[in-house]
Regions:
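Active-site loop-to-helix "anion-binding N-cap" substructures in soluble metabolic enzymes
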Residues: 1-170
Length: 170
């Protein structure tokens, strides 16, 4: 999500994951959102916090179910925030890249994330090539599936590869 001076410049990436969130909300799921932002190199950087994303996210959510934000993505703060989460609520965890384990694909980091949920849904086809803990290691520890956006993007790739318009250039 593009941010300038702490303000979101373009919320289209947030809008694109809303169908998956709505699908889960309709089923009264407890939704824990994981994401990354910038390149903090495993260190906390307040300018790369996901906190401003919550306000943008809430513009798309029902007014009576605003998303909550947790100042961490693992540890006691995250466990406590998840424990307080009720069915049909959304929780955004802090930037995964504040921990070196995210980009190093650390399985212990992934296990800590896995302890917070029951099912893993990947809705980021565009990031799925990365060998990061939240993408590569986490699905080893939870049943996994794909979200609405991922399915749409996968369908587009399949359509273009299986039935490309001619002439076709790669």
């Amino acid at each position: 999500v593009p941010v300038s001076h702490g303000k979101i410049v373009d919320n289209s990436r947030i809008a694109r994951v809303i169908p998956t969130i709505e699908y889960l909300l309709e089923r009264e799921a407890k939704i824990i959102l994981l994401s990354h932002f910038g390149r903090p190199k495993g260190q906390y950087d307040p300018s790369l916090s996901l906190a401003p994303i919550v306000d943008a996210l809430n513009k798309f959510l029902p007014k009576d179910r605003p998303a909550k934000f947790c100042v961490d993505c693992i540890g006691d703060n995250a466990k406590e925030a998840v424990a307080k989460l009720r069915s049909g609520e959304v929780l955004l965890l802090e930037n995964l890249r504040f921990y070196a384990g995210e980009e190093s694909n650390d399985e212990d980091f992934a296990k800590e994330l896995a302890m917070l949920g029951d099912i893993y849904i990947n809705d980021t086809f565009s990031c799925s090539h990365r060998s990061h803990a939240s993408i590569s290691a986490l699905p080893k520890f939870l049943p996994a599936g794909i979200g609405v956006l991922f399915q749409e993007e996968l369908s587009n790739v399949e359509a273009n590869l299986m039935k490309p318009e001619r002439p076709f250039a790669a």
